[in-house]
Regions:
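Ligand-binding face of N-terminal immunoglobulin V-set domains in extracellular IgSF glycoproteins
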Residues: 9-32, 36-43, 50-52, 57-75, ...
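Conserved, well-structured beta-alpha core segment at the onset of a catalytic domain
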Residues: 16-20, 146, 199-209, 291-335, ...
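Extended amphipathic secondary-structure runs
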Residues: 25, 84, 91, 214-221, ...
C-alpha cells in the first residue's frame, strides 16, 4: 500500500461561527509539521491565469506545530457483532451461510468467523472450514457469481462435515467432505462476516454477497441474522444473538438467492434482496485520531478556508467552508458550495488518466497526487470496485485529492486551458468576486 508522507482530512466540511472542526493528519516525517490557516481565493494552478491565491488568516489561527505520527487505514467492508457470544457445546456446532463470490484471490477470503472457527475460500477457490490449526475443504472450486449454500457440522467427538450446494443448479448434487478435527467445548468471541478481525484490524476480506448466516449449538440457534432487515442502517438487527455492526459501508439490499426478477423494488419483496455485498476495497471513514481542532471565531468572515500543513518539503491543504450564523447574513450575494458533489466525486480516478499528466502537474507546480495512482485511498461513485461492481458510497472522512487547491482533473489536453472541475473550477467565481470587490457569503449543500 502506497502512503503519502503528509496528508490529512477534516471531520466536517461545513461550519458556522462557534462550531469546531477537527483535523486528522498522517505524517511519516521525522520532525513536527506546521499548520497555518489561509483563505482560499483561487485554486487554479494555471500559470497563464492568476494562479493559486491564498490570503493569510493567522489572525484567527496562529501557525502551530504538531508532532508527526503515521496513521493507518483499513480498507475492506465487513460485519462484526456488537458484543461477544459465549457458548458451551455438549455435542455439536452447526454453521450455515449462503454466498455469491464475485472475485477470487490468491489470499484466503473469510466468509464467517467465530472464535477459532472460520469458513473461508482458500487460494484454490474452494470452500474451506478451519477449526484451530486444522482445516478441510470441498474438493471442487467454486464458480464465480453463483449462489451456494454452505453447511458445516462439527462434533465434540472429532467429526467434521462440510457440504456445499449450488442453488441455481438443481440437477447437480451437493458436494460433501468429511474429516476429523478437535473442537473446544467452550467458544467465545465476536462473530464476523466477510473478514477475520484481530485487535480491531480486519484481514482476509471476502468479495461477494453473503446471506442468511446462522450459528447453531446443540440444536439451538445462538446467532441468526436477517440481512434484509433495516437496510437503511449501518447495523443489522438479529433474530437471535447480538446486532451486527457494518464497517466501511458494504452495499445493502442487493439481490439475493431467491431473487427471480419478479420485483425490482427491494422494499416490496425484501426476501429477494436479503444479501449484503462486501468488497475488499470498500472505504468510508478512515477513523484517524484528531491532531488538533479549531473553533470558528464569531468575527471570521464567511468564505473558503484551508488549513495548510507543511514539513520537510511536503505539504497538504485541508479545505473547509464557513457560512455565516443563521439569521446573521450581511451580504446580498450568496454562493452555493456543492459539498455533496465534491464528496461524491471524491477521488474520482479517470479512465483516461496517463502518467504524462504528471508533466503538466510538475510544470504548473500543481497538486502532485492523483487518485488513479492511489486507489487504496478509496475512489468515487463514478468508479468501480475490484470485482467490477459500481461504488455506491463515498464520503469526505478521508483525504480527497480532488478537493485540494491546484488539483487538475483533465491533464492530457494540449491546450493551455486549466482542465478543472468542481472545487478548483468554482474558485473562478470566488476570485472574480474578490477582484470586483463584491461582498459575498457562502452556504454549502449540507447546510441547505
Amino acid at each position: 500500500m502506497k502512503n503519502i508522507p503528509l496528508i490529512g482530512y477534516t471531520d466536517k466540511l461545513s461550519l458556522r461561527p462557534g462550531e469546531t472542526v477537527s483535523f486528522k493528519v498522517s505524517s511519516t516525517l521525522k520532525k513536527s509539521f506546521s499548520a497555518s490557516l489561509k483563505r482560499s481565493i483561487s485554486a487554479d494552478p494555471n500559470p497563464k491565469g492568476i494562479g493559486i491565491i491564498e490570503k493569510d488568516a493567522s489572525k484567527y489561527f496562529k501557525t502551530s506545530f504538531f508532532k508527526s505520527r503515521k496513521q493507518s487505514f483499513n480498507p475492506g467492508s465487513y460485519a462484526i457483532s456488537k458484543t461477544p457470544i459465549k457458548v458451551s457445546i455438549k455435542n455439536n456446532l452447526n454453521l450455515s451461510v449462503i454466498i455469491f463470490p464475485t472475485l477470487f484471490s490468491s489470499k484466503k477470503q473469510t466468509i464467517l468467523a467465530f472464535d477459532n472457527v472460520e469458513i473461508y475460500i482458500n487460494s484454490n477457490r474452494a470452500t474451506s472450514i478451519r477449526v484451530g490449526n486444522d482445516s478441510i475443504s470441498i474438493k471442487e472450486p467454486l464458480i464465480l457469481r453463483s449462489w451456494y449454500k454452505i453447511n458445516i457440522k462439527i462434533s465434540l467427538s472429532g467429526k467434521i462435515s462440510i457440504s456445499q450446494k449450488n442453488l441455481k443448479n438443481k440437477n447437480k448434487n451437493g458436494l460433501i467432505n468429511n474429516g476429523k478435527i478437535s473442537l473446544n467445548k467452550v467458544l467465545s468471541g465476536k462473530v464476523s462476516l466477510a473478514a477475520v478481525v484481530s485487535k480491531g484490524i480486519s484481514h482476509n476480506h471476502f468479495n461477494g454477497k453473503i446471506e442468511a448466516p446462522i450459528i447453531n449449538a446443540d440444536g439451538k440457534k445462538i446467532g441468526d441474522w436477517d440481512l434484509s432487515a433495516n437496510t437503511n442502517s449501518a447495523f443489522v438487527d438479529s433474530i437471535i444473538g447480538p446486532k451486527l455492526l457494518l464497517k466501511n459501508f458494504p452495499t445493502r439490499a442487493v439481490t439475493s438467492s431467491k431473487w427471480d426478477s419478479s420485483e425490482m423494488n427491494w422494499q416490496h419483496k425484501p426476501g429477494h434482496y436479503a444479501a449484503i455485498h462486501f468488497h475488499d476495497d470498500d472505504i468510508y471513514d478512515f477513523e484517524w485520531d484528531t491532531d488538533f481542532k479549531f473553533k470558528i471565531p464569531n468575527n471570521m468572515p464567511s468564505g473558503i478556508y484551508i488549513m495548510k500543513i507543511k514539513g520537510d518539503g511536503n505539504e497538504d491543504s485541508m479545505p473547509f467552508f464557513v457560512a455565516p450564523k443563521i439569521n446573521k447574513t450581511k451580504s446580498k450575494i450568496c454562493v452555493l458550495i456543492s459539498t455533496f458533489t465534491y464528496s461524491i466525486y471524491g477521488n474520482h480516478a479517470r479512465v483516461d488518466y496517463k502518467d504524462n499528466w504528471l508533466n503538466r502537474i510538475k510544470e504548473w507546480n500543481a497538486y502532485p497526487y492523483n487518485p488513479a495512482n492511489y486507489k487504496e485511498y478509496g475512489l468515487s461513485t463514478y468508479n468501480y470496485h475490484s470485482d467490477g461492481a459500481g461504488i455506491c458510497h463515498a464520503s469526505h472522512r478521508r483525504p480527497l485529492f480532488n478537493l485540494r487547491p491546484g488539483y487538475i482533473t483533465f491533464g492530457g489536453s494540449k491546450s493551455p486551458c486549466s482542465g478543472l472541475r468542481h472545487f478548483q473550477a468554482d474558485s473562478h467565481l470566488i476570485s472574480w468576486l474578490h477582484n470586483k470587490e463584491l461582498d459575498y457569503e457562502i452556504v454549502t449543500g449540507e447546510q441547505l
